[in-house]
């Protein structure tokens, strides 16, 4: 029974890409930033080859012989956000970045949004999600106007107090925004950002919901589903692909939940892909420039990893990668244009095998399709033959 568990450590980049200057990300290295913290400890990832990848060998312990195949992944797409990164992993290289709005959204778009929702809009500028409710939360509660804001990413975010706008109503407003954000304003994601509490102590709740663009063409997920395989989505994977190609999904509130849900799926019988996103690295620590928090989150994942490895079946393959960077040590709170890691591990996978630097994240999707004997219609070149034991 063939199974692949593909785990995305959201934002765990491993060093600036050659074009990082075009994105104002020179010098970014998310993993090395976290490694400077006293709370950083990843012996299990190290055993799998994490520090033997291109660009990280100065961190390697020469006594450790990696038990897995490993590589450094280059992002071929233009952009550095979650949607673009996950789409590329699944076989779509995006020639254009998704639109961003550093000056806020155009008046015509917001006029239509106000007309359709019956509520006014406040803010309309790039903002930190925690700061925006501090600065606009009181006005929102008093007037009922929706806090609409963006970031350096391609997002249209709507913050609302759950006591003012019931959660289902907020989700409906997001669906309206998703309908009208198209063409030049076709953001990658519309995001519901509910919060609660009393002024000035507002806090975001865990009922965030993302409304993504449909992928422009079929991905690895669609091909696996068409071929009769299960495609299980853990965390925000279902949202990132707007449900396209997913056969079963479970939402999670944090990394701990994501790990537990993945372990539950590991115990179940299925044939196909379990695609996991662990978001805390990015959402809770990277964007908030919390180096120690980031290090603790990586250490926690590393602590839990043996639970998964010990329960792997004969035909299981584990792949660990990332979708972009988000260096918590730089002045920027935004994503960073970085290489990402790839670890491939399983009973059938060679140890101590370095695949070097791959041209595109899409090689991952191609390798997964080849493992399931599904002829690929996606971009990317499979590395499966290079890492399978003969």
Curated annotation (Swiss-Prot):
<dbReference type="InterPro" id="IPR024052">
    <property type="entry name" value="Phosphopentomutase_DeoB_cap_sf"/>
</dbReference>
<dbReference type="GO" id="GO:0009117">
    <property type="term" value="P:nucleotide metabolic process"/>
</dbReference>
<dbReference type="InterPro" id="IPR006124">
    <property type="entry name" value="Metalloenzyme"/>
</dbReference>
<dbReference type="InterPro" id="IPR010045">
    <property type="entry name" value="DeoB"/>
</dbReference>
<feature type="binding site">
    <location>
        <position position="335"/>
    </location>
    <ligand>
        <name>Mn(2+) 2</name>
    </ligand>
</feature>
<comment type="pathway">
    <text>Carbohydrate degradation; 2-deoxy-D-ribose 1-phosphate degradation; D-glyceraldehyde 3-phosphate and acetaldehyde from 2-deoxy-alpha-D-ribose 1-phosphate: step 1/2.</text>
</comment>
<comment type="similarity">
    <text>Belongs to the phosphopentomutase family.</text>
</comment>
<comment type="function">
    <text>Isomerase that catalyzes the conversion of deoxy-ribose 1-phosphate (dRib-1-P) and ribose 1-phosphate (Rib-1-P) to deoxy-ribose 5-phosphate (dRib-5-P) and ribose 5-phosphate (Rib-5-P), respectively.</text>
</comment>
<feature type="binding site">
    <location>
        <position position="324"/>
    </location>
    <ligand>
        <name>Mn(2+) 1</name>
    </ligand>
</feature>
<dbReference type="GO" id="GO:0030145">
    <property type="term" value="F:manganese ion binding"/>
</dbReference>
<keyword id="KW-0413">Isomerase</keyword>
<dbReference type="Pfam" id="PF01676">
    <property type="entry name" value="Metalloenzyme"/>
</dbReference>
<dbReference type="GO" id="GO:0000287">
    <property type="term" value="F:magnesium ion binding"/>
</dbReference>
<feature type="binding site">
    <location>
        <position position="10"/>
    </location>
    <ligand>
        <name>Mn(2+) 1</name>
    </ligand>
</feature>
<dbReference type="GO" id="GO:0006015">
    <property type="term" value="P:5-phosphoribose 1-diphosphate biosynthetic process"/>
</dbReference>
<dbReference type="GO" id="GO:0008973">
    <property type="term" value="F:phosphopentomutase activity"/>
</dbReference>
<dbReference type="GO" id="GO:0006018">
    <property type="term" value="P:2-deoxyribose 1-phosphate catabolic process"/>
</dbReference>
<keyword id="KW-0464">Manganese</keyword>
<feature type="binding site">
    <location>
        <position position="323"/>
    </location>
    <ligand>
        <name>Mn(2+) 1</name>
    </ligand>
</feature>
<protein>
    <recommendedName>
        <fullName>Phosphopentomutase</fullName>
        <ecNumber>5.4.2.7</ecNumber>
    </recommendedName>
</protein>
<feature type="binding site">
    <location>
        <position position="282"/>
    </location>
    <ligand>
        <name>Mn(2+) 2</name>
    </ligand>
</feature>
<dbReference type="InterPro" id="IPR017850">
    <property type="entry name" value="Alkaline_phosphatase_core_sf"/>
</dbReference>
<keyword id="KW-0479">Metal-binding</keyword>
<dbReference type="GO" id="GO:0005829">
    <property type="term" value="C:cytosol"/>
</dbReference>
<feature type="binding site">
    <location>
        <position position="287"/>
    </location>
    <ligand>
        <name>Mn(2+) 2</name>
    </ligand>
</feature>
<keyword id="KW-0963">Cytoplasm</keyword>
<dbReference type="GO" id="GO:0043094">
    <property type="term" value="P:metabolic compound salvage"/>
</dbReference>
